[in-house]
Amino acid sequence: MNRIPRRLRQLSLIALASLALSACKGADSDLSKESVVRTPEHQSELDKYIEEQFSRPYNIEVLYRYREYEIGRGWVTSPARAENSLQFVNVLRYLFLEPYVETTSKAFVRQFSPQALILTGYSGYNPPPSNTYTLASTINGIKIVFMDINHLDFPTLKALYAEREALQGKTDATSVARYNELDAQIKKTNQSYITTLRTSYLRTIYHESAHTFHQRVEPTTDFDKITSLDYKGGTWTTWWTRNGKRSIQYGFISNYASQEPHEDFAELFAHYIILTPEEWAAKMQEADVIPSGASSSGKVLIERKLAIIKEYMTRQWGLDMDLLRSNVQKRYPEFARQDFTIIH
């Protein structure tokens, strides 16, 4: 068997290394400035905006470039687009950060906000046997993965708002008809935007912020006792449907709230903050039923738990939930006026 001289072997390895480096250099030249893998020193305008407006003041890291190690392989998803990610962070500021600061302070928000928000482009597909889609997932209230960001799009209606305001007070038939037309269009679109947000994103961020409170100081155990016999643990996803019962009539604002007391706490906090008084009243009407074998209606049980949460928030953290709720919801009618596509 012929042996390759040691010196020749060394030269061959050097040559291969040179070829590999050359190949890498060629691959790098094909990468665009929007490629997923980027060095920290090459920040886009969006990166700088996130760092200056979110990371530094609020201690919230927003990661919109695809990082598999942050997401895991449990879902099939895709990268978030920069333009949709910009809308997401602006919406977050408008309906979460600014209302909290208005109610408390920036220091408070830094302490009680999730530390990292991971954005992905599409709903996370859960392969068989599940065959379901995930819109958001959390890790200990510290990191939240928000999915389907590429469908998050809220074109501004500021021109329609301005036109409506210009017609205000005019009494001729043409102006009145146009005003009413604009008013209906704005309200319908605005409500559509808010509904889309609250379905997952807004409820999730308030839900997770609620966890940060009880993780530091537990509220009274009286909360846990109110519906202690009806928590379902891991069966919450199927138990209510399978048994033909409604969780709200047993004192839970959502099926998820019936998993265990901490989720009940967070779900009740989030729903109360984001639902309007009219929507909340409608929920309580649904809950105002005493199930067979029970001694109290779901409405009574929910209101008892809510009273405990409010008292705990005021006493322990100085947070007025009704003021926070008001500061969030007074922004709803003006939501579609905002332009979430620009770097402020």
Per-range role (PLM):
Residues 2-12:
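Bacterial N-terminal signal peptides that target proteins for export
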Residues 4, 24-111, 295, 308-344:
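Acidic/polar, low-complexity intrinsically disordered N-terminal segments immediately downstream
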Residues 19-23:
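C-terminal motif of bacterial Sec signal peptides marking the signal peptidase cleavage site
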Residues 29, 86-170, 175:
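Auxiliary, metal-adjacent structural segments of Zn-dependent hydrolase domains
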Residues 74-82, 151-155, 188-196, 200, ...:
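Second-shell loop/turn segments in exported
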Residues 146, 159-171, 177-180, 184-187, ...:
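Active-site recognition of the HExxH zinc-binding catalytic motif
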Residues 202-247:
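Acidic, glycine-rich loop-and-strand cores that form catalytic or ligand-binding grooves
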Residues 231-344:
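Metalloprotease/metallohydrolase-associated module, dominated by Zn2+-dependent proteases
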